[in-house]
From Swiss-Prot:
Protein name, per record: 3-dehydroquinate dehydratase
PROSITE patterns per record: DEHYDROQUINASE_II
Family named by the database record: Belongs to the type-II 3-dehydroquinase family.
Residue positions of the active site: Y26, H103
Reaction(s) catalysed by this chain's protein: 3-dehydroquinate = 3-dehydroshikimate + H2O
Domain of life (superkingdom): Bacteria
Subunit structure: Homododecamer.
Chain residues that bind substrate: N77, H83, D90, L104, S105, R114
Length: 149
C-alpha cells in the first residue's frame, strides 16, 4: 500500500460494558481489549485506526460526519441502534464510506426484534455471532477491500 489507510472503529450503546454485560451473549472480553487487538493489527498492516464508542446516537452521527473524506473504511457495531436508527444509516450513506456491520452475538438466534437491521443492505458485509473475533475478521476484510481499490 502506497498510502496509509485510515479506518474508524465505531461502537454503539452499552458496548463500553463488554466483559461485564451479559457474557452469555457478548463474551467476557472488554471493549478495551478488542480495541487493543485491532490497534495491534493496524500496526502490523501499517494503517491508522481510530476507536470511538458512544451511548448516544447523536455522538455516533457526529463522528461519522467528521469522517467524511478523512476515513477510508468504517467498522461499526451499531449495537441496539441496528434495529432502530434510520439516522445512523443515513449518516453512513451521506459520507459514502464503505463499512462492515459487526455483531458479537448471532442476532438471528435471539429475540425477533433483533433480526432486522437498518444497515445490512447497505454494508459491504455483515459479521455476527463470532464474538470478539468478528472485529478481527472485519478488519482483515477492510484491508483486502482497500488493497483492491
Amino acid at each position: 500500500m502506497s498510502q496509509t489507510h485510515r479506518i474508524l472503529l465505531l461502537n454503539g450503546p452499552n458496548l463500553n460494558m463488554l466483559g461485564a454485560r451479559e457474557p452469555k451473549h457478548y463474551g467476557s472480553i472488554s471493549l478495551e481489549s478488542i480495541e487493543e487487538k485491532i490497534q495491534t493489527l493496524a500496526t502490523q498492516h501499517n494503517v491508522k485506526v481510530e476507536c470511538f464508542q458512544a451511548n448516544s446516537e447523536g455522538k455516533l452521527i457526529n463522528k461519522i460526519h467528521e469522517s467524511f473524506q478523512q476515513v477510508d473504511f468504517i467498522l461499526i457495531n451499531p449495537a441496539a441502534y441496528t434495529h432502530t436508527s434510520v439516522a445512523l444509516r443515513d449518516a453512513l450513506l451521506a459520507v459514502s464510506i464503505p463499512f462492515v456491520e459487526i455483531h458479537l452475538s448471532n442476532v438471528h438466534k435471539r429475540e425477533p426484534f433483533r433480526h432486522h437491521s437498518y444497515f445490512s443492505d447497505v454494508a459491504e458485509g455483515v459479521i455476527c455471532g463470532l464474538g470478539a473475533k468478528g472485529y478481527e475478521f472485519a478488519f482483515l476484510f477492510a484491508m483486502d477491500y482497500l488493497a483492491k481499490k
